[in-house]
């Protein structure tokens, strides 16, 4: 009863607060990368393993109560020290997402003794020495200014007011603050000090950062400093909860009056939760009605809804002239939305309602997965006669349409092929390790690799194929995927791990280098995989490289990719590298790796030739 009374009093205390439920639009994210150079004369495998261990431990320590982590691995030589600081207004999911993106960048580009990356949402640093006492380092402090001038005479006064307010607020509020000045023009500002800084050092860092931003001439700028982050913009880039976060005095009042046992972060969370509860309670009847009338819609709360009629019109009623292709989950159409945006609309087919429910549960899981080498899911429509998914539109064709076309006008250069291979490896590595939910693609192949205007690869259909039921285009094995790309343990025994994707990736990169498609039913010396293996044994691997390149390629890179491909297609799961190891091998010229020990697995030997190539 006493607890209930306290909660009631607390709700009454916060009821006067007026908060908007909308989230401000985010500006484009920027990042600043600084690296210690890689020692090309000494590649230490234990260094990579130590790095991966240290980063893995950081991910485990990110919680609702703590969005900053100090970690170290000291049983390796040299030791590895890691520090992560996320913005205090981020969710755990967003913090982990930023951490994993930053970690991948450091892993690819900063494999030397140390490196740091600063983005709008988090800061990540690693080094081989303890840097916990380093709060100021002008050599790494930088202000990124937008070039466009403001054109407003009073803007500077409003900007200075916002920067001063947010600095004072952050120092008083444990290192974080958000503020706005809305007059003839709006200015929004956000400040974050690292949690390892005391109040005086935080103030010093933000004052220096503020001085650097005053030299900028634009509507948006950010200061990436060693111990803090400061940003302003004329566009709102944080939500209302960040700006109305209780300061230290308010938290002390709440704690002393109602909950003396709670920590600062618990009080903040309780305040936000109480406000949210008040809003939800007032809208309860309306929400209940929506849930009853749109029960199916509620199954995918994180999926942005598109009206079926709008998508039907955008695709000209799914006319064949708008059809882009067909995958394992359904047909894909080009759509032009009323605002002029071009999207890709996938019209799904299901056998039963059970499969539909399972599928949309999975859509709910993957809707937040975002990476530059993954096709982005924009939303869905689930209330019309057909279930639809809406993806970003990738302007170029799929990789197979460019790579295997005999009379194609454009022959992919070696540089383009190598960049495509790097991008695919990074996208797969993110699915396996970088996203909050591990996703095994199951159907990596050239037709599921889309190319944008710059020929950068984007992986399509990730996370979806595993929810589909069996239909007439599939054999009765119950296995999802495409023959020729299926790993033996998955095809024969149904055992699925991320190494199944590694196998398919190996086939894919061999196809990219050779320019030849792997046919699941081609036996003996006619098989692309077998031919590359034989050339490897005979030390004539260069003869496997696509002759259309006419010698215009970096032989060392091409041979290395083929050897990595052979490592990936070995029958034994244990002998195949992980995608993290593959990314490291591809990114680092001097990386050493074992030679393949087993010939490639030729999956056609376990199936009859008259079966469909899709399972």
UniProtKB/Swiss-Prot annotation:
Q: Identify its membrane topology class.
A: Single-pass membrane protein
Q: Where are the transmembrane segments?
A: 267-287
One GO cellular component term of this record is: membrane
Query: Which segments sit on the Cytoplasmic face?
Result: 288-615
Output the PROSITE patterns linked to this UniProt entry: GNK2, PROTEIN_KINASE_DOM, PROTEIN_KINASE_ST
SMART domains, per this entry?
A: S_TKc
Q: Which UniProt keywords apply?
A: ATP-binding, Glycoprotein, Kinase, Membrane, Nucleotide-binding, Receptor, Repeat, Serine/threonine-protein kinase, Signal, Transferase, Transmembrane, Transmembrane helix
Q: Which reaction does it catalyse?
A: L-seryl-[protein] + ATP = O-phospho-L-seryl-[protein] + ADP + H(+); L-threonyl-[protein] + ATP = O-phospho-L-threonyl-[protein] + ADP + H(+)
Positions bound to ATP: 324-332, 346
Q: Does the keyword Transferase apply?
A: yes
The UniProt record lists the EC number as: 2.7.11.1
Catalytic residues (positions): 443 (proton acceptor)
Q: Tell me where in this chain the Protein kinase domain is found.
A: 318-602
**One Gene Ontology MF term:** protein serine kinase activity
Q: Which residues are glycosylated?
A: 100, 165
Pfam families, sorted: Pkinase, Stress-antifung
Tissue specificity of this protein: Expressed in the whole plant at low levels.
Domain Gnk2-homologous, first and last residues per copy: 29-131, 137-237
* Signal peptide (from-to): 1-28
UniProt family annotation: Belongs to the protein kinase superfamily. Ser/Thr protein kinase family. CRK subfamily.
Descriptive protein name:
Cysteine-rich receptor-like protein kinase 1
Organism of origin: Arabidopsis thaliana (Mouse-ear cress)
